[in-house]
Amino acid sequence: MSEQVEKVRRALIGRVVSDKMQKTVTVLVERRVKHPLYGKIITRSAKYHAHVEDGGAGEGDLVEIEECRPISRTKTWRVTRVVEKARVI
């Protein structure tokens, strides 16, 4: 009777633009949408603060973030994995 149903959490992929805070990174997520009237493809972007426990994500890394419970006033996302490390030139 009391089955535990796990909620489907939103997951996004974005690039880390700042890692200056302790245990927090700022992730820029870009998405492409079609303009409703003119039909042109537009790039929309949003920045999210995400919790990273062991400092595994650095600036320039491509990461996957997922929604979680509120960790602080601005953090409701957590880094689940690093998809691609930043290349040092």
Curated annotation (Swiss-Prot):
<protein>
    <recommendedName>
        <fullName>Small ribosomal subunit protein uS17</fullName>
    </recommendedName>
</protein>
<dbReference type="GO" id="GO:0019843">
    <property type="term" value="F:rRNA binding"/>
</dbReference>
<dbReference type="InterPro" id="IPR019979">
    <property type="entry name" value="Ribosomal_uS17_CS"/>
</dbReference>
<keyword id="KW-0687">Ribonucleoprotein</keyword>
<dbReference type="Pfam" id="PF00366">
    <property type="entry name" value="Ribosomal_S17"/>
</dbReference>
<dbReference type="GO" id="GO:0003735">
    <property type="term" value="F:structural constituent of ribosome"/>
</dbReference>
<comment type="similarity">
    <text>Belongs to the universal ribosomal protein uS17 family.</text>
</comment>
<comment type="subunit">
    <text>Part of the 30S ribosomal subunit.</text>
</comment>
<keyword id="KW-0689">Ribosomal protein</keyword>
<dbReference type="GO" id="GO:0022627">
    <property type="term" value="C:cytosolic small ribosomal subunit"/>
</dbReference>
<keyword id="KW-0694">RNA-binding</keyword>
<dbReference type="InterPro" id="IPR012340">
    <property type="entry name" value="NA-bd_OB-fold"/>
</dbReference>
<dbReference type="InterPro" id="IPR019984">
    <property type="entry name" value="Ribosomal_uS17_bact/chlr"/>
</dbReference>
<comment type="function">
    <text>One of the primary rRNA binding proteins, it binds specifically to the 5'-end of 16S ribosomal RNA.</text>
</comment>
<keyword id="KW-0699">rRNA-binding</keyword>
<dbReference type="InterPro" id="IPR000266">
    <property type="entry name" value="Ribosomal_uS17"/>
</dbReference>
<dbReference type="GO" id="GO:0006412">
    <property type="term" value="P:translation"/>
</dbReference>
